Amino acid sequence: MTAVEPRPVPQLEATRPYPARTGPKGSFLYKMVTTTDPKVLGTMYLVTAMSFFMIGGLMALLMRGELARPGLQFLSPEQFNQLFTMHGTIMLLFYATAIVFGFANIILPLQIGAPDVAFPRLNAFSYWLYAFGATMATAGFITPGGAADFGWTAYVPLTDILHSPGVGTDLWILGLAVSGLGTILGGVNMLTTVVCLRAPGMTMFRMPIFTWNIAVTSVLVLLAFPLLTAALFGLAYDRHLGGHIYDPATGGILLYQHLFWFFGHPEVYIIALPFFGIVSEIFPVFSRKPIFGYTTLVYATLGIAALSIAVWAHHMYATGAVLLPYFSFMTFLIAVPTGVKFFNWIGTMWRGQLTFESPMLWSLGFLVTFLFGGLSGVILASPPLDFHVTDSYFVVAHFHYVLFGTIVFATFAGIYFWFPKITGRMVDERLAKWHFWATFVGFHTTFLVQHWLGAEGMPRRYADYLPSDGFTTLNTISTIGAFVLGASMLPFIWNIFKSYRYGEVVTVDDPWGYGNSLEWATTCPPPRHNFYELPRIRSERPAFELHYPHMIERMRAEAHVGWGSGKHGTPQDDDALLAKK
């Protein structure tokens, strides 16, 4: 018998959408530090912002643990002050604002058919300014006097050298100035990219709603953030150079409030409008319908942006120094374009073929939660009602319903929606739905009861209360909900790790099947410069037309925006125009 050499058995290897290694060992960190690829920078924004979200969430759990029962449990009033100051700062400026630029860097160039952003190196510089500024402000916790402890609004005279002598205050001021500069430069970059780098055929009214919202947000950034920077430099000048810019004797306290809130209210829409754009991308895909009222959505976005810079002093009703009828009327008015958006989102789903994958669930959670927050906002817009609940937990509940409802729900909707495009792998739908329901139940348990706490008179920012105040039961319920909310992040973290390493590999351009915008017309993940070839752009749905060419004539015939409406000519006119270019 002759021995036969055994045939080699092929070794099983995990398939990966990326090569196992693209350079010498240890080069990953160098590439990350020196990259100008907007997709890599966007991922870095997302990871950094979500890390700060977790840190801010841990601070919230410490505060809720302290407030669960009357009496001081484990925090001193000074520590409590530091926690709510840094919690607000981190969540608004280091999580919400930053994650906007995470999504914008990854998705916006893809949606307009651009190979890169307008200023790639400035883009990288913006990220590192944000990262260093955020780290600087948070580093106050390791200084002898602790972190900033005057509330995230930093009202004067709480921030002067007499009342806040510690280094933590200076780190907070400088950290916000540095990260704010990064935000300003990011806004310049995104606006220039939208104006200058759109693909042939991509007119303004063929841009996706998300791109429109990022462009409008960038304009608001350029209006609002320089004012914050100026106000912060004024604080530093008063603290260390003996200035009297915010001297109470000359009305400096109200001057600071006007400066801060002229930044602060547009900031709310800077961190809301992009997430309106995210859900506007998701609803059509999972309703199997085009977006309802595309043009109206664009004008509603412009209306919200215009009104957002006209209502800043509704945060100052209690000062008695603002024109109540004007600011109340303008605040009521801002509900109109927001209501138009709700009408369009519901119209998009109306009689659609709905499927409830995780991005759609999170978007519906956004709708419900943001609606509640908007209704309590209408209450607060009325001065007679606002006077009774100002600086109470009613305001805390409203603020979290509006911002958590908008930002966090839409953040997770966007992450689950674009995760296949970013990584080339699908997420685990079962874990994503567990994550959604735990977050939804935990959030509403935490913050719904805080409306009643505020109506009963519990002030915000207090570290303690008396058993006789009658706040114990509702505070206990709120704390239980907060810990459910905190635990809901565990399936998310595991899902992202598991899906990135072992998730099902995406082999098609559009894993959801009904994508409309251009990011669904390139590979998952996209190449370095986004596209190997671009499809013709003849409407606001180029990817859908690419994948379903037999639907084009019907779409033209039924269009309200596009060639069928008679507003823009014919497809042949479009071809002739492209040939001239």
From Swiss-Prot:
Gene Ontology terms, cellular component aspect?
plasma membrane
Question: What are the binding positions for heme a3 in this chain?
Answer: H398
The cofactor named in the record is: Cu(2+); heme
Known EC number: 7.1.1.9
Which InterPro entries does this chain map to? Cyt_c_oxase-like_su1_dom, Cyt_c_oxase-like_su1_sf, Cyt_C_Oxase_1, Cyt_c_Oxase_su1_BS, Cyt_c_oxidase_su1_bac
Q: Report residues of the 1'-histidyl-3'-tyrosine (His-Tyr) crosslink.
A: H265-Y269
The residues that hold Fe(II)-heme a are: H87, H400
Q: Where are the transmembrane segments?
A: 43-63, 90-110, 128-148, 171-191, 214-234, 259-279, 291-311, 320-340, 360-380, 399-419, 434-454, 477-497
Q: Does the keyword Amino-acid biosynthesis apply?
A: no
**Protein's UniProt keywords contain Iron:** yes
Per the record, the domain of life is Bacteria
Q: Catalysed reaction(s)? A: 4 Fe(II)-[cytochrome c] + O2 + 8 H(+)(in) = 4 Fe(III)-[cytochrome c] + 2 H2O + 4 H(+)(out)
State the Gene Ontology terms under molecular function: cytochrome-c oxidase activity; heme binding; metal ion binding
Annotated binding of Cu cation, by residue: H265, Y269, H314, H315
Membrane topology summary: Multi-pass membrane protein
Keyword set for this entry?
Cell membrane, Copper, Electron transport, Heme, Iron, Membrane, Metal-binding, Respiratory chain, Translocase, Transmembrane, Transmembrane helix, Transport
GO term, biological process aspect, one: respiratory electron transport chain
Pathway it belongs to? Energy metabolism; oxidative phosphorylation
Cofactor, how bound (note): Binds 1 copper B ion per subunit. Binds 2 heme groups per subunit.
Q: Which Pfam families match?
A: COX1
Location in the cell reads: Cell membrane
- What NCBIfam families is this protein classified in? CtaD_CoxA
UniProt family annotation? Belongs to the heme-copper respiratory oxidase family.
Q: How does it assemble?
A: Associates with subunits II, III and IV to form cytochrome c oxidase.
**Function according to Swiss-Prot or TrEMBL:** Cytochrome c oxidase is the component of the respiratory chain that catalyzes the reduction of oxygen to water. Subunits 1-3 form the functional core of the enzyme complex. CO I is the catalytic subunit of the enzyme. Electrons originating in cytochrome c are transferred via the copper A center of subunit 2 and heme A of subunit 1 to the bimetallic center formed by heme A3 and copper B.
Protein name, as recorded: Probable cytochrome c oxidase subunit 1-alpha
Protein species of origin: Nocardia farcinica (strain IFM 10152)
As recorded in Swiss-Prot or TrEMBL, the protein's gene is named ctaD1
